[in-house]
């Protein structure tokens, strides 16, 4: 199980991403339309002033059951350990363990 502080940090990042996404998108669109170098620098400065954790690149997917960040399966929102256990128990609809 991941530390609670790490899980809370990721939740904080998700909140910041959703809060600043419109502003960040607007600045990036403006950056594409502007042609002068000085204007681009000014827009980059505005982007840099946004909180660092509001960037979607800093978000890390985590398993909703354990908080584990590695070996994460997007389709299920689970890490490989939990996915395997739940598949064995038949808790994931439509998923069966193969055997031959």
Curated annotation (Swiss-Prot):
Single GO term (MF): rRNA binding
Keywords: Chloroplast, Plastid, Ribonucleoprotein, Ribosomal protein, RNA-binding, rRNA-binding
Ion transport listed as a keyword: no
One Pfam family here: Ribosomal_S14
Subunit field text: Part of the 30S ribosomal subunit.
Family: Belongs to the universal ribosomal protein uS14 family.
Protein name: Small ribosomal subunit protein uS14c
Species of the source: Emiliania huxleyi
